[in-house]
Amino acid sequence: MDKVIYPGTFDPITRGHEDLIQRASRLFDQVVVAVAANSGKSPCFSLEERVEMARAVLAEYANVEVTGFSGLLMEFTRQQQAHVIVRGLRAVSDFEYEFQLAGMNRSLYPDVETIFLTPSEQYMFISATIVREIARLGGDASKFVHPLVAERLYEKRKK
């Protein structure tokens, strides 16, 4: 069975993430959305909140599983017995970092391939960082995220 890992912080999960996951779900038998407990970032939402939102947003996809993880992505990939990682590239500026990361990952676990997908045109400009900033400043981020996520962003802003 072909299993792919789609890692990210998903803080929050956006329509762009959904687009890539939906497309990956057509290419692979199983997609594991790996929500990182990234210690290098200060997320707006807790790991548990991010996992819960992603599960709710992606519930319609029978071959998509959402799980949180901490530590090295390659160790998680090994534990999942997966051999492919999918990453999204929105712009050329994403490529250099992702290319370096893919090379480092390959040096740690040579059996794992990294595949890059570009988002559909209408999602190329969406980033979770920008979505959070729009919401934080009182703007309407609802067209960039699932309604559940938009509601959670609104609730965060009120606090």
Curated annotation (Swiss-Prot):
It comes from the Bacteria. Substrate binds at residues 9, 41, 73, 87. It catalyses: (R)-4'-phosphopantetheine + ATP + H(+) = 3'-dephospho-CoA + diphosphate. It is found in: Cytoplasm. Pathway: Cofactor biosynthesis; coenzyme A biosynthesis; CoA from (R)-pantothenate: step 4/5. One of its GO terms (cellular component) is cytoplasm. ATP binds at residues 9-10, 17, 88-90, 98, 123-129. GO terms for biological process: coenzyme A biosynthetic process. The keyword Thylakoid does not apply. InterPro entries: Cyt_trans-like, PPAT, Rossmann-like_a/b/a_fold. GO terms for molecular function: ATP binding; pantetheine-phosphate adenylyltransferase activity. CDD domains: PPAT. It is an enzyme of class 2 (transferase). Keywords: ATP-binding, Coenzyme A biosynthesis, Cytoplasm, Magnesium, Nucleotide-binding, Nucleotidyltransferase, Transferase. Its EC number is 2.7.7.3. Its cofactor is Mg(2+). Its main location: cytoplasm. The record marks 17 as: Transition state stabilizer. Disulfide bonds: none annotated. Belongs to the bacterial CoaD family. Homohexamer. Reversibly transfers an adenylyl group from ATP to 4'-phosphopantetheine, yielding dephospho-CoA (dPCoA) and pyrophosphate. This is Phosphopantetheine adenylyltransferase. The gene is coaD.
